[in-house]
Amino acid sequence: SRHLRELVSLTGFPITSTLQGLGAYPGDDPQFLGMLGMHGTYEANNAMHDCDLMINIGARFDDRITGKVDEFSPGSKKIHVDIDPSSIGKNIKVDLAIVSDVTELLKSLNKRFKEKNKNFVSSNKQKTSKWWEQIGKWREKKSLNFINSNKVIKPQHAVQRLYELTKNQDTFITTEVGQHQMWAAQHYKFNKPNRWMTSGGLGTM
């Protein structure tokens, strides 16, 4: 998680996450676009669709993320990093496959970026400024907004309040599968790794 945060800071790139990856990058950081996929944010899904370079670190391109595989991010070059070679190219064809331990790869990438000239970070952020402007427009849609009520407890509001009351504690969140799982994933900002325990593709209850 620390090396991932450093990479995002060095590059100025936006970052999103799958359901199982929540917490690997701080959920309250401005460069985090929220969760990706069927139950993800408008900005995360549009950024993934329109990007020119996609770096997939340890995710498997499942159907909840890709939708129609032939329409998934059609204009991007795709780099897929995974320690398991059988996971690469299984669902989505990629342009560069890297079989590696993620921590070691991130260390190497960060080292190379740091070896660039001192103006690299600021110049790279300038190059992505228009991209961030577009992301800002998508964010204005506020895709996870809901109409609160003073008559009933809205689940989204309950999760948000839980976050506010526990964000300064070392909190672990667990769910089974279903709609409440999606509300938790959408409205609780996981800021540390391994604090989110939930069933993914197997859908166990």
What are these regions (language model features)?
Residues 1, 62-67, 182, 205:
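Short glycine/serine/threonine-rich phosphate/pyrophosphate-binding segments
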Residues 1-6, 67-69, 161:
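A short acidic, amphipathic alpha-helical/loop segment
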Residues 1-18, 53, 170-171:
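Catalytic alpha/large subunits of respiratory electron-transfer oxidoreductases
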Residues 2-6, 11, 43, 94, ...:
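Conserved catalytic alpha/beta core of Sir2/sirtuin-type deacylases, generalized to analogous enzyme cores
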Residues 4, 134-205:
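Active-site diphosphate/adenylate-binding microenvironment
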Residues 7-10, 14, 108-112, 161-165, ...:
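Generic, well-ordered alpha-helical scaffold segments in large soluble proteins
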Residues 16-18, 56-57, 100, 173-177, ...:
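General beta-strand structural signal in soluble alpha/beta enzymes
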Residues 21-130:
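Glycine-rich, acidic loop regions that bind phosphate or pyrophosphate groups
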